[in-house]
Amino acid sequence: MRELVLNCREAQADALSDALLEAGVLSVSVEDADLGTEAERPLFGEPGTEPQVQAWERNCVVALLPDGADPAQILEQAIAAAGLDPALAHGWSLREVPDADWVRLTQSQFGPIPISERLWIVPSWHRDDPAVPGLVPDAARDAIHIELDPGLAFGTGSHPTTHLCLAWLEAELPAGARLLDYGCGSGILAIAARKLGAGETVAVDIDPQAVQSTVDNAEVNQVRLQAMLPDALPAGEFQVVVANILSNPLKVLAPMLAGRVAPGGHLVLSGVLERQADEVAAAYAPWLTMSVWRERDGWVCLHGVKA
C-alpha cells in the first residue's frame, strides 16, 4: 500500500482532509510538518488543562491510498472539491507502507501486565500463556487475573495511575466492602475490586461507551456489578470510593465524592501528578485528610479515611 504525503497550511488541512476522504482515500491523518525539528510545536497541555497551541502552522497531510489509485488524480479532485489553490497539487510525494498483519501487530504490543505477584491483567489472546501464574496447571494457585482487551474506554492496566489504584485495592481493600468506582472507563478497577473480595460494587462514568465497556468486561470476567451514568447513581454511602480521573475534575467533584464516603471509609484518588498532590488534597480537606499512598513514574495515589 502507498501513502500520499502533502504539506499545507493550517487553514487548508481540514478541508483537504475531508475532500481526500470524499475522493476515495482509505484514511487521512494530519501531522506536524516540522516534527523532529526545532520548529516542532507540541499540541498537548498538562493533564486537565487546555493546550496553549491549538494547531500547527505547517501541516503534513497523509492519505492512505487504495490499491491501484492514481495519486495525482485523487489530489487534483480533492483540491478542486475543497476550493483550494490548484498550486497545492505540486510538491506531493508517495511513501510505501509495508504489508503487515495489523491484528497480530496490535496484539503483540499488549502483553500480560503484572500488578503484583498474584494480580495480573491479561488480554484475551494470552489466556493460555504459561508465563502468567494461575492460567495453567501447577502455577500459583491464588493468582487473580483480569481479562481485558484494549478498547474504546480508558483503562488497560498499563498506565501508572491504573496500576497504583489496582495496587491499593490488592493491598488495602476491606473484605466485603461496598465500593464505588467513579470514572470507571473500562471497568478495570471495579472488576478487580470484585475479584479481590469487594461486596456490592457500582461503576460510574459520564461516557455511555465506557458504561457499556464495563458491562461487557464484567461479563467476560464473570463478576457481578452495576454500571451506570452519573445521573442514575442512587443515594447512599460506600466503604470505598475510588476515582482515577484527572486533577481538575477531582477538585470539582470533591464535595460529591467525599460525600459518598461512609464514616470510617476510604477515598482513593489517582490521575494526579506528583506536583498536583497538595492542591488536590486541599480540595478534600474539609472532609478528609488525604496523603500520598504511593508514587509511580511521577503520578501519585492519594488516600484518606473519613472520620
UniProtKB/Swiss-Prot annotation:
Extract the CDD domains matched here.
AdoMet_MTases (cd02440)
MF terms from GO for this chain are: protein-lysine N-methyltransferase activity
Top-level taxon of the source organism:
Bacteria
Q: Which residues bind S-adenosyl-L-methionine?
A: T162, G183, D205, N244
Q: Which Gene3D superfamilies match?
A: Vaccinia Virus protein VP39
Reported EC number(s) for this entry are 2.1.1.-
Q: Where in the cell is it found?
A: Cytoplasm
Q: What is this protein's function per UniProt? A: Methylates ribosomal protein L11.
Reaction(s) catalysed by this chain, per the record, are: L-lysyl-[protein] + 3 S-adenosyl-L-methionine = N(6),N(6),N(6)-trimethyl-L-lysyl-[protein] + 3 S-adenosyl-L-homocysteine + 3 H(+)
Query: Quick one: signal sequence residues?
Result: none
The entry sums up its family as follows: Belongs to the methyltransferase superfamily. PrmA family.
The protein's predominant localisation is cytoplasm
Encoded by which gene? prmA
Instruction: Give the keywords, sorted.
Output: Cytoplasm, Methyltransferase, S-adenosyl-L-methionine, Transferase
* Annotated protein name in UniProt: Ribosomal protein L11 methyltransferase
HAMAP family attached to this UniProt entry? Methyltr_PrmA
Gene Ontology biological process terms from the UniProt entry: methylation
| EC class name | transferase
- Pfam families registered for this protein in UniProt: PrmA (PF06325)
